[in-house]
């Protein structure tokens, strides 16, 4: 070890000690060879793995992180995220379109700017919301938002549960009109009204009929502070997932209710890192069935 630094020697001794705490060059060499062999086995990107990756990305639109996390959690052989990203980049360079099925298409996107919204009268502030909601440990607390179509025409309602990340979506027949939105929300959630304790929204005038929502669904409706999208971070993130299927500047006239249900299913069927790679739909229906 004459040419090695003291720190290198220390690491070598620490990594390759025997069970008795002593260092043996022979044992160290055997451990090193075993470690290399294990690394080679783990890193080999087999044909079966590639088929699995292609399926999850192209058919289910799972992220690389979701694929790796789900496979490791369920004992399915898989390589690391870096290897999969290299595979996607290589596919793109070879004229493939696998990257088009990833959420950001290998590009970093900047956050959208938020426009000023009208004041909603007699609303309950998020500051009045029970503390347990912010802890995100109790089932039954939801965030609501709208995704707006091209030219500010048409709207899709999104409602997501905080603990399971279960998403419900609906294309609104009359866009952002408050009465129509309330009608659609009540109709969509009526079968699950016993599992909705609170809903938190932004200050958009489209939620001004919240009192009727509270009465019909027997819940409490709260509003975040103006220009504070981080108070509804789950909605913001979930809308980003929806945008993978419905990009900005999409004309909503071309989107069918069947397609909305299909996108909803796919998002709820993705394993999520925040859920320890469980799927939202599995966790949600464990609670309600």
Locations of the language-model features?
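Active-site beta-loop-alpha junctions of metal-dependent nucleic acid enzymes
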Residues: 150-152, 169-193
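Acidic/histidine-rich, metal-coordinating catalytic segments
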Residues: 194-209, 227
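Mobile genetic element proteins and their domesticated derivatives, centered on retroelements
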Residues: 9-12, 53, 67, 84, ...
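Basic, flexible linker segments flanking DNA-binding modules
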Residues: 25-34, 77-134
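Two-metal-ion RNase H-like nuclease active-site motif
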Residues: 139-149
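Charged alpha-helix within mobile-element recombinases
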Residues: 47-60, 190, 211-221, 225-289
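Short, basic alpha-helical/linker "hinge" immediately adjacent to a nucleic-acid-recognition surface
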Residues: 1-60, 65, 70, 76
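Short conserved beta-strand segments at catalytic cores or DNA/RNA-binding microdomains
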Residues: 147, 151-169
């Amino acid at each position: 070890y004459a040419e090695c630094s003291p720190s290198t020697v220390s690491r070598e001794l620490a990594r390759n000690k025997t069970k008795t705490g002593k260092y043996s060059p022979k044992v160290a060499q055997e451990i090193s060879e075993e470690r290399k062999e294990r690394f080679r086995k783990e890193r080999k990107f087999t044909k079966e793995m590639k088929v699995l990756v292609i399926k999850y990305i192209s058919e289910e639109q799972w992220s690389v992180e979701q694929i790796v996390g789900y496979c490791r959690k369920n004992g399915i052989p898989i390589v690391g995220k870096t290897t999969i990203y290299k595979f996607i980049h290589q596919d793109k360079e070879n004229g493939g379109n696998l990257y088009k099925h990833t959420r950001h298409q290998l590009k970093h996107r900047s956050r959208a700017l938020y426009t000023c919204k009208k004041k909603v009268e007699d609303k309950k502030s998020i500051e009045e919301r029970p503390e347990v909601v912010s802890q995100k440990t109790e089932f039954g607390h939801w965030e609501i938002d709208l995704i707006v179509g091209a030219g500010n025409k048409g709207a899709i309602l999104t409602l997501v549960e905080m603990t399971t990340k279960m998403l419900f979506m609906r294309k609104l027949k009359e866009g952002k009109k408050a009465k129509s939105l309330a009608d659609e929300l009540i109709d969509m959630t009526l079968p699950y009204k016993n599992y909705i304790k609170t809903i938190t929204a932004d200050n958009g005038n489209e939620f001004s009929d919240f009192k009727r929502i509270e009465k019909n669904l027997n819940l409490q409706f709260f509003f975040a502070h103006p220009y504070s999208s981080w108070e509804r971070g789950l909605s913001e993130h979930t809308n980003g997932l929806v945008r993978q299927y419905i990009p900005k500047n999409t004309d909503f006239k071309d989107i069918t209710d069947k397609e909305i249900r299909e996108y909803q299913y796919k998002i709820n069927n993705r394993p999520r890192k925040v859920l320890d790679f469980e799927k939202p739909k599995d966790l949600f229906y464990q609670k309600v069935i």
